[in-house]
């Protein structure tokens, strides 16, 4: 593995860790309606479990409501059941093939729990970043041991790996701070 490939590989892994964090945070409920809340909902359809997005269209007509337009009328009760089982704290209101999900306001206690959870996700991501850094540094040690790179170059590349880790760590901090503000906004 050459130096450029190593750096690119580390950057891709760190970017992937950041994307995972982003995906986890989208699942955290804020006061605003978001179709991402329903990503975890599966529906018993045609003899198998399917994601909700494959049996209905999802929209947010306003900041406090999610609309689920079920395509097949026979699936409405199955979709309602899937939403209830997902335990998201949402109560479906059905009107024909349209299911409305009013988003209740979050209590202060629940907001605090969500902020703690967001911080936990952030810390888990930082642990992933540090593991990626460690793996990169081990590759550098091996390259130096095999006389592929000199000691000075090893030191320089280690500093670059550390800078990359610091950059991504600060990105994690800003993403978490932004999510915290989103959750705490009433």
From Swiss-Prot:
Keywords: Cytoplasm, Protein biosynthesis. Pfam families: RRF. One of its GO terms (cellular component) is cytosol. This is Ribosome-recycling factor. One of its GO terms (biological process) is cytoplasmic translational termination. InterPro entries: Ribosome_recyc_fac, Ribosome_recyc_fac_dom, RRF_sf. The keyword Acyltransferase does not apply. HAMAP family: RRF. Responsible for the release of ribosomes from messenger RNA at the termination of protein biosynthesis. May increase the efficiency of translation by recycling ribosomes from one round of translation to another. Belongs to the RRF family. CDD domains: RRF. It is found in: Cytoplasm. GO terms for molecular function: ribosomal large subunit binding. The keyword Ligase does not apply.
């Amino acid at each position: 593995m050459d130096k450029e490939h190593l750096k690119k590989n580390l950057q891709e892994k760190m970017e992937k860790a950041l994307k995972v964090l982003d995906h986890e945070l989208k699942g955290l409920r804020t006061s605003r309606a978001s179709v991402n809340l329903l990503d975890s909902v599966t529906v018993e359809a045609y003899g198998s479990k399917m994601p909700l997005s494959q049996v209905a269209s999802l929209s947010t007509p306003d900041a406090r409501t999610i609309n689920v337009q079920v395509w097949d009328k026979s699936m409405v009760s199955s979709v309602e059941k899937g939403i209830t089982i997902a335990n998201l704290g949402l109560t479906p209101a059905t009107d024909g093939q349209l299911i409305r999900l009013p988003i209740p306001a979050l209590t202060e206690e629940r907001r605090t729990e969500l902020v703690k959870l967001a911080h936990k996700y952030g810390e888990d991501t930082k642990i992933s970043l540090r593991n990626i850094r460690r793996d990169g540094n081990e590759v550098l040690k091996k390259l130096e041991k095999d006389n592929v790179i000199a000691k000075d170059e090893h030191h320089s590349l280690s500093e670059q790996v550390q800078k990359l880790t610091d950059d991504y760590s600060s990105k994690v901090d800003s993403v978490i701070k932004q999510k915290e503000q989103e959750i705490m906004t009433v």
